[in-house]
Amino acid sequence: MLRYCAEHGARLFLDECFLDLSDDGVSMKDCLHDWPQLLILKAFTKSYGMAGIRLGYCLCADGALLGEMAKSTQPWNVSSLAQAAGVAALKEQAFLQQTRALIRTERQWLMGELAALGFRVCPSKANFLLLHGPEDLHQALARRGIAIRRCGNYYGLDNGWYRIAVRRHEENEILVAAMKQACAGR
């Protein structure tokens, strides 16, 4: 894909925001200097649970492009508090390792529970699962105070596809119990 972009004067924008939470994730950052048309987006929102701070960054080896991007940003676009939080978060590699281990354990448990309920669950190495179930599953769960991501607007998927987050065990148990209730009421 990078070669194609280079041959056609296009840029490849790669979102690595979930990469730190995935098993065996391999960043493309080592390719930046060989492929100047590559831009990599990283964010603290997913890996560090810092959604309210809205902090992220872009990696790119094209100095001219970075200069143009800098011209279009506001002078004070990132607060000093957000910068300090980002620097502190990057030092917490042990936190990421613990989080990945938790996700790995909970993902396996959740996949087994959902498969036992009859859901088609796609293999995953990330902190979320893609599954197929009843088209009204989101409504049944919403009545129980649980929101899941409908994926019927994703290319190639219909209204029975959903994405759920892998969370702490107690939260995953609540989700599974609600899904059991939703399926039992059919």
Which residues does each predicted region cover?
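Active-site pre-lysine segment of PLP-dependent enzymes
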Residues: 1-12, 16-47
